């Protein structure tokens, strides 16, 4: 059976992995998931990520990050979904917790944070919010 929303599956695996205090979570890889993982790493929400080929299929491994035994990611939510896409202009991009969190946005220049998209003067699809 095919997956309806692979990004939501990725976010759920990260959320569940941190609740279970796992060091690492694995999932089927894609370019979009890899881009999201890169943004999470650049923003300091995950320790590292990598793509391995298991049985000829790419697998994305994400090393989760904890601070004093608590997960670094407090909230990770999907915003735009297959049934209801959410697009925002540069002026309408959400500020998560007054700028303390990030919104991950898919733009024509790739996947980036809301701050980077605002700096480039671009809007796009709001994939998720992380705090």
Swiss-Prot record:
It comes from the Bacteria. InterPro entries: Ribosomal_uS8, Ribosomal_uS8_CS, Ribosomal_uS8_sf. The keyword rRNA processing does not apply. One of its GO terms (biological process) is translation. One of its GO terms (cellular component) is ribosome. The keyword RNA-binding applies. Residues 1-27 are annotated as: Disordered. Keywords: Ribonucleoprotein, Ribosomal protein, RNA-binding, rRNA-binding. SUPFAM superfamilies: Ribosomal protein S8. One of its GO terms (molecular function) is structural constituent of ribosome. It holds the Pfam family Ribosomal_S8. One of the primary rRNA binding proteins, it binds directly to 16S rRNA central domain where it helps coordinate assembly of the platform of the 30S subunit. HAMAP family: Ribosomal_uS8_B. Part of the 30S ribosomal subunit. Contacts proteins S5 and S12. Belongs to the universal ribosomal protein uS8 family. This is Small ribosomal subunit protein uS8.
């Amino acid at each position: 059976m095919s997956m309806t929303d692979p990004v939501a599956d990725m976010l759920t695996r990260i959320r569940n992995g941190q609740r279970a205090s796992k060091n690492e979570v694995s999932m089927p890889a894609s370019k979009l998931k890899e881009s999201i993982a890169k943004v999470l790493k650049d923003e300091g929400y995950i320790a590292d990520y990598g793509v391995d080929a298991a049985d000829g299929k790419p697998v994305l491994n994400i090393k989760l990050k904890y601070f004093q035994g608590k997960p670094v990611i407090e909230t990770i939510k999907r915003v735009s979904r297959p049934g209801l896409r959410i697009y925002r202009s540069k002026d309408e991009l959400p500020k998560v917790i007054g700028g303390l969190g990030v919104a991950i946005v898919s733009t024509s220049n790739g996947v980036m944070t809301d701050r980077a998209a605002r700096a480039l003067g671009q809007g796009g699809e709001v994939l998720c919010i992380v705090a």
